[in-house]
């Protein structure tokens, strides 16, 4: 997710000698990615991409804290000026506002009632909001957007006098309930959504996502409820995606915002409303906090940090980095005890997470490149993992003149292979036409071929397909698909491709069985299991279960001494019924004599086939007299066992 942050606003919390460009370069190298800097008048606005696991950086304060750790490691001075508020008493109940909640739905709720004068915001607030891409509305609404960008927790304002019974009853929605959001759009709720009603069943807020039109601040508003809620982010995301409401508040809340920053956010909002809306607090601050964040500490030794990173980082540097990031650190001899601040409890779990924080802030670019030390006796070998074999196969296809394609995992109904009731359908697809997860690669690769005007095409793709199961999650399986479109292409092109791939993987037990469904082609068999198929229609297509194939991959090379004596080669032409597979014929002929070295299919015309037979002895040179009885035995096998007619 991207946010816009003005440099002038950031300077309220960060004191540094880095120029805007130097700031952007240093942060992009070790932290967030600053994609663009735009000069706006005398100010600079940073366009910052924040990764989904760091909602704590979706604010001015969060970026300032992060920069105070990063910049000193890049040679700049940087001081974080923390956001502080005075201690403020709170209560769980108030006569002016009744809030009932479900602990399974909310982590924390805070609210306060204020009298205000509603009017336009001062210029500095509207200017700052405009630079962050937010339209100024009025001083009450603008304050909620302002404190969200500054501190990082969304908030909302209700018109207090439009709340029937002055009640907020937080509950799960019922399927079919309708709401009209503050932008005037009507939605039918799917059910199980987190909502607030007025105590009589009328929904007045879609919590954490968007307010409703029946409780929003209007021109005549005199009293407001400043409201902050921290909810079950899994339910919230589901609602947001189902309804297609992707407000910044929804996106931020679904990441799991830190509930401990709610009090400073609320107090800051109150102070801004006092200053710019002549606000008077007319109720206690309500604070309902059933699911408090549990503190977490992680221990890691200095030796482990140095071992994992590969260089020795001074102890003081480690402490400075961690403390600048907001962690509490105590050191006892060689061990660091790190207290995880609440904004990072969902992100930092194990010692390696701490080490990663130290390494990235210190700067990966400052760690010298070096090979691992090996002793003379070390038995070094390259691990032949899945990635290795896939790269070998891809390189081979490119060498053979194939083009690799990448297609979408989501497909239309037309590109789903088989009955549509077997398809995995998304509840919230990004586009209406692509709603199904593919169960085969071939239809998509053929679709790519159809969009190409060339008549001679050789395409391949290696990617995952998704197979529905009766119970549990679907299977995600790696497949290879090949499409050959050229003049005079035949089944044997596909067969040759499969055999060549098997050879690269060191597999010698691939076999083929004629398809039983009447389609011209063959099933690909390995260890008695069907792992794919070849089909010869308008195009020659191959699809193989790569995961099954790789289980048998073997990098061990078996050396055979070359024969010292020349082979004898004969061609045998026969007419043979089409239903006999070559693999079966080859097996029978090779077993007829130990001198039959190899059998290959040289030519095919309808049912007429020409086999090339290579005879070889490793002890002597063969003569025509040696092979005559073997040749007679081969002819007998072909005529009796395979009903062939010699040509």
Please provide the spans of the model-predicted regions.
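A carboxyl-terminal module marker
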Residues: 4-7, 20-22, 324-330, 337, ...
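An acidic, glycine-/histidine-flanked metal-binding catalytic module
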Residues: 246, 266, 270-280, 478-497, ...
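Glycine-rich, charged/polar anion/phosphate-binding loops
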Residues: 96-99, 179-183, 206-214, 252, ...
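Class II aminoacyl-tRNA synthetase-like tRNA-binding/catalytic domains
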Residues: 168-217, 305, 369, 373-476, ...
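Short histidine-centered catalytic/ligand-binding loop motif
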Residues: 130-136, 251-258, 430-434, 480-491, ...
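RNA/tRNA-interacting regions in translation and RNA-turnover enzymes
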Residues: 1-386, 393, 488, 610
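His/Asp/Glu-rich mid-to-C-terminal helical/loop segments that flank catalytic regions of hydrolases
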Residues: 260-278, 448-453, 457-460, 628-634
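Short flexible coil/turn linkers enriched for glycine and charged/polar residues
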Residues: 4, 40-42, 105-108, 332-334, ...
């Amino acid at each position: 997710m991207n946010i816009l942050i003005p440099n002038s606003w950031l300077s309220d919390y960060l004191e540094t000698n880095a120029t805007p460009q130097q700031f952007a370069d240093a942060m992009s190298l070790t932290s967030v990615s600053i994609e663009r800097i735009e000069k706006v008048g005398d100010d600079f606005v940073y366009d910052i991409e924040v990764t989904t696991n760091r909602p704590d950086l979706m604010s001015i304060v969060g970026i300032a804290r992060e920069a105070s750790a990063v910049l000193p490691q890049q040679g700049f001075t940087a001081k974080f000026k923390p956001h502080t508020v005075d201690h403020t008493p709170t209560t769980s109940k108030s006569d002016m506002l009744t809030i009932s909640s479900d602990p399974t739905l909310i982590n924390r709720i805070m609210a306060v009632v204020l009298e205000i004068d509603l009017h336009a915001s001062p210029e500095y607030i509207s200017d700052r909001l405009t630079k962050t891409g937010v339209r100024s509305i009025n001083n009450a609404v603008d304050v909620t957007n302002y404190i969200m960008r500054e501190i990082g927790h969304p908030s909302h304002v209700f018109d207090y006098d439009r709340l029937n019974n002055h009640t907020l009853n937080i509950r799960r929605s019922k399927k079919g309930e309708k709401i009209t959001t503050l932008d005037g759009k009507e939605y039918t709720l799917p059910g199980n959504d987190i909502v607030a009603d007025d105590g009589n069943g009328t929904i007045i807020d879609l919590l954490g996502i968007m307010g409703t039109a029946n409780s929003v601040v209007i021109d005549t508003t005199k009293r407001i409820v400043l409201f902050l809620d921290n909810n079950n982010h899994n339910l919230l995301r589901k609602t947001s995606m189902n309804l297609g409401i992707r407000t910044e508040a929804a996106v931020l809340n679904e990441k799991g915002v830190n509930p401990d920053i709610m009090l400073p956010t609320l107090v800051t909002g109150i102070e801004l409303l006092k200053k710019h809306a002549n606000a008077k607090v007319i109720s206690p601050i309500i604070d309902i906090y059933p699911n408090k964040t549990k503190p977490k500490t992680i221990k890691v030794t200095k030796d482990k940090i140095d071992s994992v990173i590969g260089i020795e980082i001074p102890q003081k540097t480690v402490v400075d980095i961690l403390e600048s990031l907001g962690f509490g650190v105590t050191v006892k001899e060689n061990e660091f005890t790190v207290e995880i601040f609440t904004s990072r409890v969902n992100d930092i779990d194990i010692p390696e997470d701490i080490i990663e924080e130290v390494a990235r802030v210190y700067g990966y670019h400052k760690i010298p490149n070096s090979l691992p030390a090996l002793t003379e006796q070390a038995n070094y070998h390259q691990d032949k993992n899945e990635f290795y074999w896939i790269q070998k196969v891809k390189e081979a296809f490119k060498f053979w003149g194939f083009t690799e394609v990448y297609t979408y995992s989501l497909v239309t109904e037309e590109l789903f292979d088989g009955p549509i009731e077997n398809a995995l359908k998304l509840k919230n697809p990004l586009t209406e036409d692509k709603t199904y997860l593919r169960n085969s690669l071939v239809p998509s690769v053929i679709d790519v071929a159809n969009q190409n005007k060339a008549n001679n095409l050789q395409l391949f793709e290696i990617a995952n397909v998704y197979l529905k199961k009766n119970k549990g999650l679907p299977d995600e399986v790696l497949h290879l698909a090949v499409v050959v479109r050229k003049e005079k292409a035949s089944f044997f092109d596909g067969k040759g491709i499969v055999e060549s791939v098997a050879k690269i993987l060191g597999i010698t037990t691939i076999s083929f069985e004629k398809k039983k469904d009447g389609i011209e082609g063959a099933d690909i068999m390995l260890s008695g299991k069907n792992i794919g198929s070849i089909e010869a229609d308008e195009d020659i297509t191959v699809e193989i279960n790569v995961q099954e194939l790789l289980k048998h991959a073997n990098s061990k090379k078996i050396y055979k001494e070359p024969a010292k004596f020349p082979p004898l080669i004969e061609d045998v032409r026969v007419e043979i019924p089409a239903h006999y597979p070559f693999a079966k014929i080859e097996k029978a002929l090779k077993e007829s004599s130990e001198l039959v070295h190899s059998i290959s299919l040289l030519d095919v015309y309808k049912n007429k086939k020409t086999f090339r037979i290579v005879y070889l002895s490793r002890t002597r040179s063969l003569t025509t007299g040696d092979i005559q009885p073997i040749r007679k035995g081969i002819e007998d096998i072909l005529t009796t066992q395979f009903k062939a007619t010699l040509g």
